[in-house]
Amino acid sequence: RHFLSSVSRILRHQVNFNEITLPERIVKVDSFPMGIDYNKFEAAAQNHFKNTEEQRTELQRRLDHHSNETPEAKLILSIDRLDYTKGIANRIRAFEYFLDNHPEFIEKVRLVMLAVPSRSNVPQYQRLKREIDELVGRINGKFSTVSWTPIWYFYRSMPFENLIDLYTSCDIALLTPIRDGMN
């Protein structure tokens, strides 16, 4: 509303409902609220907790196993598009720094990372993926024990029900954008 009013008053363009008439074209304007559909996620989470053992996904069974085997351990969740603005490599390095400086947390905390493929044909993004793969491999090799891997790394999209599994099972959400205005 305010944008269209400014276009009309300041720029002196004709505004008709949600359209701006310019000499060479008509621009359609609309608002798109940011964020998630909270009600959808809340309902899915509530339904999730009602699932019987047979209704649980394979991912949820694995998360449950982790929780049952190590009830004091914490899961840190990180979900982002694979994008240089998201700070994923820095986040992984910070996790390594944490484990280096606080070895008492080895086997007591795990980073669950979901990197959703994005622009996978762009060389810069291919380099970023390779860097992240190498960091995860190095850290898992450095800190893993027979019964524990510090980072569970998934490079793919996940079905909504698996996202709900992650959101409802993890203890901490970790978002570390470098340059991002939508979080």
Named regions from a protein language model:
Residues 1-183:
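Catalytic cores of carbohydrate-active enzymes across secretory and cytosolic contexts
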